[in-house]
Amino acid sequence: MTNTQTRVIKQINKTILATCSFIFLFGFFLSSATSTILIQTNEWSILTAAILISIVELFNYLKHKFQFNDRKSGYNCFFFINLAKLGLLYGLFIDAFKLGS
């Protein structure tokens, strides 16, 4: 590999890392916004949890139904949605610890 190719690959890797970090933190933000806005009244808490779990399980079903072994065009979409899902679940997990303490 030439020096130019190495620099291009390093720049692409930095861009991918920044994009993945942004999407994960966006999922974390969604969990904070969801728990702050929709769960202010006690009537919405069970419905909100059921909807979020349904969305996560639907995504898991679709991901395992269309398993992407190679890097097709749909792979990146599922990868980024999975990162947002992980951020969402991590944020809800952290909120549960905050409520428990």
UniProtKB/Swiss-Prot annotation:
Q: Which InterPro entries match?
A: Uncharacterised_Ycf20 (IPR007572)
| Any Pfam family | DUF565
Where in or outside the cell is it found?
Answer: Plastid, Chloroplast
Q: Which family does it belong to?
A: Belongs to the ycf20 family.
Specify whether Chloroplast is a keyword of the entry.
Answer: yes
Annotated keywords: Chloroplast, Plastid
Record bears the keyword Plastid: yes
Gene Ontology CC terms: chloroplast
Provide the protein name. Uncharacterized protein ycf20
* Originating organism: Cyanidium caldarium
